Amino acid sequence: MTRAWLTLVLFLVSTSALAQTHTPRLIDVHMHYDGEPGILDQVLVKLEAADGIAFLLTTPKGFPQANKFIQEHPDRFIGFGDIKLDDPDVLHQIDRFHAAGFRGLGEITMTRKPYDDPAYWPIYDRADKYHMILLFHTGIVNRLHPQEPADVSFDRSRVTRLDLIARHWPNLIIIGAHLGNPDYEEAGEIGRWNPNLYFDVSGTTLIKKKADYRFFQSIFWWTAVASPHTPASGASAFEKLVFGSDVFGGELDEFDSAQARYHAMLDDCEVPQSVQAKIFSGTMWHILQLQQAQAPSKDVNQGKQ
């Protein structure tokens, strides 16, 4: 490792700690960035107004710009590495994102095998080693170019694929995007038994369920239930949710629209404001604090691997 690279790594490590000194009002766990020009400045304005933090899901294409911006605004952005599980150099990519101070990986999607296939276990081992949060796409997968052949299957990304991962790596924090759309009941049940598994309800779920938001009371049903058949907890079942906007392609209107839909659903379900505060920021803020305390110091020798 050259002296210049070592200096850069040490600088990134020194700036990777949480810069916020108070619990923000909003943490968006699901914001994509692929190098779109000018978008980061616009996102920053929205985050400043909301007293928010965004997990910036950064592709290799967007990495140079995002990494610089995150270092300049560590109180508003946390880096996530947008990796492809089937890339032959994926472990090296994880090392690179970790060395840059990124705190998680995702959105993981469009894999050639099911998420819980043993072929991907070395990737989860590496994430576990670095205490990185994993964000998985769950449920139906979009098809933006229907005229082109694609090796993509909804079945590989079913939310039930996260159950084995959550059990096998009990210290990994896992977020399932989209609440498994349309497999909501399965999502709720595996979330109920896996304390390290959370969900966002970004995407189309809160659009198609707009006329029946109370439906989610049947998914998150176990609040205050005393039974040997469900984990003992004083927490609201809705605390399995965290906020995600799923902004992509620079469509920033979705940042505001997603918040409005979340609030409408939670209000219809009579979720207390104290619990809503956890969903919008408190739960994830607590996780980030624990992650920072538990994470090993960055290995400046990993570049020699």
Residue positions per predicted region:
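Divalent metal-dependent hydrolysis catalytic cores, especially in the metallo-beta-lactamase
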Residues: 26-29, 42-61, 77-82, 103-109
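Sec-dependent signal peptide recognition
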Residues: 2-10
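Catalytic pocket-lining loop regions of alpha/beta-barrel enzymes
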Residues: 104, 117-242
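N-terminal signal peptide c-region/cleavage motif recognized by signal peptidases
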Residues: 14-16
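Mid-to-C-terminal alpha-helical segments outside catalytic/metal-binding sites
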Residues: 2, 20-30, 38-53, 228-242, ...
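Histidine-centered divalent metal-coordination motifs
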Residues: 30-34, 137, 178, 246
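Active-site gating/metal-coordination segments in enzymes
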Residues: 21, 61-156, 205-206
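Alpha-helical scaffolding segments of alpha/beta enzyme cores, especially the outer helices
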Residues: 42-45, 65-68, 92, 96, ...
